[in-house]
Curated annotation (Swiss-Prot):
Main location class: plastid
Family the entry assigns: Belongs to the ATPase B chain family.
An example Gene Ontology molecular-function term: proton-transporting ATP synthase activity, rotational mechanism
Subunit structure of this chain's protein: F-type ATPases have 2 components, F(1) - the catalytic core - and F(0) - the membrane proton channel. F(1) has five subunits: alpha(3), beta(3), gamma(1), delta(1), epsilon(1). F(0) has four main subunits: a(1), b(1), b'(1) and c(10-14). The alpha and beta chains form an alternating ring which encloses part of the gamma chain. F(1) is attached to F(0) by a central stalk formed by the gamma and epsilon chains, while a peripheral stalk is formed by the delta, b and b' chains.
Gene: atpF
Superkingdom per UniProt: Eukaryota
UniProt membrane topology term: Single-pass membrane protein
General function of this protein: F(1)F(0) ATP synthase produces ATP from ADP in the presence of a proton or sodium gradient. F-type ATPases consist of two structural domains, F(1) containing the extramembraneous catalytic core and F(0) containing the membrane proton channel, linked together by a central stalk and a peripheral stalk. During catalysis, ATP synthesis in the catalytic domain of F(1) is coupled via a rotary mechanism of the central stalk subunits to proton translocation.
Pfam family name, one: ATP-synt_B
Subcellular location per the Swiss-Prot or TrEMBL entry: Plastid, Chloroplast thylakoid membrane
UniProt name for this protein: ATP synthase subunit b, chloroplastic
GO cellular component term, pick one: chloroplast thylakoid membrane
Transmembrane segments: 28-48
Length: 180
């Protein structure tokens, strides 16, 4: 780099006539100016550029480290979540199986209870029917007996006269006397 600088300086210091004068060649002058500016930038800007690039490199490295840590943490959390999911799924299956067996058990209990209740109600129904039937028979007997007694009384009242009445009383008294 120093060689280029010396070459450019030597070109600028030489004039075509051998003395100090104006260079009318704009292209050469522009190239010399660009070279001088670049040399100055390289010499004086090297530290700034190095610091800028080092800072940028450190930021990138830190960002990558943080990303790796976050990735590791996310993978760890994912593995824990998957393990927890498997555990919960197994528990859900177990609860489902247990629930189905409990439902079947409760269903059987309900069927048995309903069957027993139906038997009890059927027995009560039969008892009630029997009681009602017996009550109806008793009511009919009582009515028939009452009707019969009323007829007998009517018949007796109509056919009894005082003489027949006395004779019946005597016969009954004599029968009672023979029983003793």
């Amino acid at each position: 780099m120093n060689d280029v600088t010396y070459y450019l300086i030597s070109l600028a210091s030489q004039s075509p006539a051998g003395s100090f004068g104006l260079n009318t060649n704009n292209l050469v002058t522009t190239l010399i100016n660009i070279g001088v500016v670049l040399c100055l930038l390289i010499i004086f800007g090297k530290g700034f550029l190095r610091n800028f690039l080092d800072t940028r490199k450190n930021k990138i490295v830190n960002t990558m480290q943080i990303s790796d840590e976050l990735y590791s943490s996310a993978v760890e959390k994912l593995e824990k979540a998957q393990a927890r999911l498997c555990k919960v799924e197994n528990e859900a299956k177990q609860l489902r199986v247990t629930g189905y067996s409990e439902i079947e058990h409760e269903k059987l209990n309900l069927i048995n209870s309903t069957y027993k209740t139906l038997e009890r109600l059927e027995k009560k129904k039969k008892e009630t029917c029997s009681f009602e039937q017996q009550q109806a028979f008793n009511d009919v007997r009582q009515w028939v007996l009452q009707q019969t007694l009323q007829r007998v009384l009517k018949t007796l009242n109509g056919s009894f006269n005082p003489e027949l009445h006395l004779r019946t009383i005597r016969i009954n008294i004599s029968m009672l006397g023979t029983l003793k």
